Every structure is written in structure tokens, then in C-alpha cells.
Regions:
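Structural motif corresponding to alpha-helix initiation and N-cap regions
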Residues: 41, 105, 123, 134, ...
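Extracytoplasmic/periplasmic regions of membrane proteins
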Residues: 118, 229, 239-242, 257-260, ...
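ABC transporter nucleotide-binding domains
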Residues: 2-4, 9-183, 188-189, 193-202
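Residues that scaffold the ATP/ADP-binding catalytic core of kinase and kinase-like folds
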Residues: 68, 142, 215, 284, ...
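ATP/adenylate-binding site constellation spanning eukaryotic-like Ser/Thr protein kinases
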Residues: 62, 72, 90, 203, ...
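ABC transporter nucleotide-binding domain
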Residues: 167-253
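C-terminal coupling/interaction segments
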Residues: 255-299
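Alpha-helix N-cap/helix-start and coil->helix boundary motif
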Residues: 8, 65, 91, 188, ...
Length: 299
């Protein structure tokens, strides 16, 4: 399990991460979302020991990353697919990591096969790799030590639709086998499809966290009648706050039973009475981070 407690990082007078607390549970995929500059990458860098925290803790199974004796055997990390030795081949990069971790040489070919890098591609210099190939190599390196935790920052960048689906299936299977995945991505649809839990950060602070079903759950009631004006007056008389929907009908936070009772007492015939649809991830994300967004920036 990943545990972040009261984590703070300041640079002079600027606070990049401000009292952040969250967990990423075993056997689950946790989506870590936020606009550009919200503190996602800084949090992940602190978690894997690349940036010191000003205050607070970030641990993996109760230990700091820097205290792990052979971290690659316990935690797989991919923060920047372009941060690879451009003059080495993909196979050489994996071989160096394999020897550092004390793994059998066969593990290199196993990982190349897993991420679908051919022998020809594996023997090319990384400077000649596309971004998608670098992402696959980064995933291979992260999984090389058979870790039980994965920490990934934008791992789908540069992947085509087939590659994104491959990534999704890979991470879903990894979590289902008992692994812990902390995943940062600006591809909100992919996060919505794969994540079990969500953590949303804005201006360095957590603005929402919980299971995906909790955060995207439906709230309130949608109701229509043959006379929505009269229905609105009846709801107002019953002290039930409500709003008129742009596409017709009324939305209220009251439950369906209560709304139905009010309509019955007013002698109104309802043509629709249902729980409100849950918000999509994009809608929820934009609403929660509205104060931190720049025009045209989604994550």
C-alpha cells in the first residue's frame, strides 16, 4: 500500500504540495488527477525519493522508497519515458537494470516480449525510438523486478489506441493479481475506465478522493410533469430547493419518494421521476478544479 501523510513541499515562498494525504490500496488502481502544475509530479517524485519533502511522509508498505534495500524488486516506477540513455539500446537498458537488481538474464527477454518490443526494436538505440516505444520500454523496466507496486506518470503518452488498450489491460490484470497501481494521467476517459479509486489535486491540495463509484455517483432526482411551472411552485412550497434543467424537467437534491409525495399532494401528473445520472469523470474533474484551470488545459 502507498501512504502519503500531510505531505508538503515548498520552494522558497511557493508551496507546490500543501498538506497532501491519501492512500493507494493493494489490489486497486488509484487514479491521481489534477491540472498542469497542481502538484501531481512533485508528489510522485517525493514518493520515489527524487525530491525531498519539506514536511510529511510518503511511504510504500510503511517504508520510504530510499530505505528499500532493492527498490526495483518492490516498486516499479515510470515518471518520464524520455529520461532514458539515448545512446543505449532498449535491450542494454533492461540488461543494466536486470544486473543491478540481481535478476536472471532471461528476465530481459520476458519483459521485451511482454511489452511487444521485437528483437529488431530492442537492438536499436533509444534515440531512434518513438515516444510510444519509449513508453513500452519504460513499462518493461518498471515491471522487470516483478514489483508489487507500480507508480506511473502519464504512461499512455505516445501510445496509439491499440497501445492504450494494451496498457489498460496490463494494469488491470496487475491490480487484479494483488498489485498496487498509482497512476497519473491526463487521459480522463482511460482513468475512468480503469481506476477503482480517484484522488484529485488542485493548487497543491487534495480537493476530492474516494472510490470512483462514490465520486461519480448520482445525486438527487430528475422529475418532469405535464406542468413543470406548477411542479416548481409545489416544490418551493414544500421547501425543496430545485433547478430547472436546460433540456426540460427539474433537478432537486430531494429523494424520489419525497418528490413523488409532493407531486401527488399537488394533484400533478408526473411524466418522469428518476435518480439523477452520475456525473462523468471529465465533468467532475472540471468542476472540482475550476479555480485552478487555465483555458484549454484539462489535466
Amino acid at each position: 500500500m502507498i501512504s502519503v501523510e500531510s505531505l508538503t513541499k515548498t520552494y522558497g515562498g511557493f508551496t507546490a504540495v500543501d498538506d497532501v494525504t491519501f492512500t493507494a490500496a493493494t489490489g486497486r488502481v488509484t487514479g491521481f488527477l489534477g491540472p498542469n502544475g497542481a502538484g501531481k509530479s512533485t508528489t510522485l517524485r517525493i514518493l520515489v525519493g527524487l525530491t525531498p519533502a519539506t514536511a510529511g511522509t510518503a511511504t510504500i508498505d510503511g517504508r520510504r522508497f530510499t530505505d528499500l534495500p532493492n527498490p526495483g524488486r518492490e516498486v516499479g516506477v515510470l515518471l518520464d519515458a524520455s529520461a532514458q540513455h539515448a545512446g543505449r539500446t532498449g535491450r542494454e537498458i533492461l540488461t543494466v537494470a536486470q544486473r543491478t537488481m540481481g535478476l536472471p538474464t532471461s528476465r530481459v527477454q520476458e519483459m521485451l516480449d511482454l511489452v511487444s518490443l521485437t528483437d529488431d526494436e530492442a537492438d536499436r538505440r533509444v534515440r531512434n525510438y518513438s515516444l510510444g516505444m519509449r513508453q513500452r520500454l519504460g513499462i518493461a523496466t518498471a515491471l522487470l523486478g516483478d514489483p508489487h507496486v507500480l507508480i506511473l506518470d502519464e504512461p499512455a503518452n505516445g501510445l496509439d489506441p491499440a497501445g492504450i488498450r494494451w496498457m489498460r489491460d496490463l494494469l488491470r490484470g496487475y491490480a487484479d493479481r494483488g498489485g498496487t497501481v498509482l497512476l497519473s494521467s491526463h487521459l480522463l476517459h482511460e482513468i475512468e475506465v480503469i481506476a477503482d479509486d480517484l484522488v484529485v489535486i488542485g493548487n497543491g491540495r487534495i480537493v476530492a478522493q474516494g472510490t470512483k463509484s462514490e465520486l461519480l455517483a448520482s445525486v438527487g432526482t430528475v422529475v418532469r410533469s405535464r406542468d413543470d411551472v406548477a411542479l416548481g411552485r409545489a416544490l418551493q412550497a414544500a421547501d425543496i430547493d430545485h433547478t430547472v434543467r436546460p433540456d426540460g424537467g427539474i433537478h432537486t437534491d430531494a429523494g424520489t419518494d419525497r418528490v413523488g409525495e409532493v407531486a401527488l399532494a399537488a394533484g400533478l401528473v408526473l411524466t418522469e421521476l428518476r435518480h439523477a445520472d452520475g456525473a462523468g469523470l471529465e465533468e467532475m474533474f472540471l468542476e472540482l478544479t475550476a479555480d485552478t484551470q487555465r483555458e484549454g488545459v484539462a489535466a
